[in-house]
C-alpha cells in the first residue's frame, strides 16, 4: 500500500500536525510518501520529519522525468499536471506506485484521531470521503461535463482517495480533453475529476461518521463572520467516533491555534452510544443537471441579497472567470 501526500513546505504549520497524527495513529508498518514541487521544499520537509523513520520525501518532478512514466504519453494528463498544484494529486501518487498497488491519497490537512488501518480496496473501484455539499467548480467545467455526458458524483470530498493503481489513463486523458479549458487558478477542478472518476470506477464514500469532513455551511460562515473563535467552531464538530477529520478550507488554520489539537483530542474522547462499521461504504450518488441548475439559481439569489459580500466569499458563478 502506497500512502501519499502532496504538499509544499508552506503548508507545514498545519500539515506537520496532521502528518504526525497520521504517523502516530496508523497501525500498520506502511511508509508515508511526501511529494513536493521543488528541491528546496524537499529539504524543508525532510528536516521537518527527520525524526519519523516511516516518512519519505520526494521531489515529484524528478519522479515524473523517469522514462518509465506512462503518463508522459498523454497530453491531457500532462496539461493537467502543469495546471494548479493541487491537481497533481490525480497524477503524482502513481509515480511511487507499481501496477496493482493500493494507493491512498491524503490531503495534508487531514487530522487523524484514533488508531486505524486502511482497509484494502481489492478491486478497481474508488473510495472517497463524503461531504454534505460539494465543491464541483468552476461552473464552466461542470457545464462541460454535462454537455459531454460525463457522469458526476455528488457529495465528493477529496480529503482521502483510495484506489488500485493505475487509474485508467486513457479515459482520464479523454475526460480532461473533453472538459475543455481548465482554469489553472481553480483548485476545485481536482474535485470535478475525482467526481468523474467516481462514476466511472464505482465504489463509494467512506463512512462520514468515521471519516469526517468540515462543512463550510452557510450557518458556519455567518458564525465566523460574527466573530466565532477557532475553539467555538471546533466545538460544533462531533468527533465521538471519528478516525479522521478533514479540516478543509479555513479550518486547517485552526489546527495550529493554541490549544486546538488538545481540544480536538478532548472532543474525540467523548463517549459514543454507537459503534460504526469501519469497513462500510455508501454508494456514490449521481450529481444531476437538475440539482446543478438549482444550485446556480440559489447562488444568483444569494448574490443578489448581498450574502457573499457579507461573509466575504466569492460567488460560485464568479470562480474561474
How would you label these PLM feature ranges?
Residues 153-247:
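Catalytic core and acceptor-binding pocket of nucleotide-sugar-dependent glycosyltransferases
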Residues 31-37:
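Short internal beta-strands
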Residues 116-180:
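Conserved catalytic core of nucleotide-sugar-dependent glycosyltransferases
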Residues 223-321:
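Long, low-complexity C-terminal extensions of enzymes
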Residues 85, 89-135:
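GT-A fold catalytic core of metal-dependent nucleotide-sugar glycosyltransferases
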Residues 1-20:
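N-proximal low-complexity "stem/linker" segments adjacent to membrane-targeting elements
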Residues 21-29:
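Short, acidic, metal-binding catalytic loop of nucleotide-sugar glycosyltransferases
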Residues 45-99:
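Active-site-proximal specificity loops/subdomain of glycosyltransferases
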Amino acid at each position: 500500500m502506497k500512502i501519499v501526500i502532496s504538499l509544499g513546505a508552506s503548508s507545514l504549520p498545519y500539515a506537520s500536525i496532521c502528518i504526525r497524527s497520521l504517523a502516530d495513529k496508523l497501525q500498520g508498518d506502511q511508509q508515508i510518501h511526501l511529494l513536493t514541487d521543488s528541491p528546496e521544499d524537499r529539504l524543508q520537509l525532510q528536516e521537518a520529519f527527520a525524526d519519523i523513520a516511516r516518512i519519505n520525501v520526494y521531489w515529484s518532478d524528478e519522479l515524473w522525468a523517469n522514462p518509465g512514466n506512462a503518463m508522459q504519453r498523454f497530453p491531457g494528463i500532462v496539461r493537467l499536471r502543469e495546471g494548479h498544484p493541487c491537481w497533481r494529486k490525480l497524477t503524482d501518487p502513481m509515480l511511487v506506485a507499481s501496477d496493482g498497488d493500493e494507493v491512498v491519497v491524503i490531503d495534508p490537512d487531514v487530522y487523524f484521531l484514533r488508531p486505524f488501518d486502511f482497509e484494502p480496496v481489492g478491486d478497481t473501484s474508488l473510495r472517497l470521503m463524503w461531504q454534505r455539499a460539494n465543491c464541483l467548480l468552476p461552473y464552466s467545467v461542470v457545464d462541460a461535463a454535462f454537455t459531454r455526458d460525463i457522469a458526476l458524483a455528488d457529495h465528493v470530498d477529496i480529503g482521502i482517495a483510495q484506489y488500485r493503481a493505475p487509474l485508467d489513463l486513457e479515459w482520464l486523458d479523454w475526460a480532461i480533453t473533453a472538459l475543455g479549458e481548465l482554469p489553472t487558478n481553480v483548485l476545485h477542478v481536482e474535485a470535478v475529476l475525482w467526481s468523474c472518476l467516481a462514476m466511472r470506477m464505482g465504489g463509494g464514500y467512506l463512512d462520514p461518521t468515521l471519516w469526517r469532513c468540515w462543512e463550510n455551511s452557510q450557518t458556519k460562515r455567518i458564525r465566523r463572520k460574527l466573530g466565532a473563535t477557532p475553539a467555538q467552531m471546533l466545538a460544533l464538530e462531533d468527533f465521538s467516533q471519528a478516525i479522521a477529520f478533514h479540516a478543509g478550507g479555513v479550518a486547517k488554520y485552526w489546527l495550529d491555534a493554541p490549544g486546538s489539537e488538545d481540544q480536538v483530542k478532548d472532543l474525540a474522547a467523548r463517549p459514543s452510544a454507537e459503534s460504526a462499521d469501519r469497513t462500510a461504504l455508501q454508494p456514490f450518488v449521481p450529481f444531476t443537471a437538475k440539482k446543478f441548475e438549482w444550485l446556480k439559481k440559489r447562488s444568483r439569489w444569494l448574490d443578489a441579497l448581498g450574502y457573499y459580500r457579507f461573509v466575504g466569499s466569492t460567488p460560485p458563478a464568479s470562480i474561474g472567470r
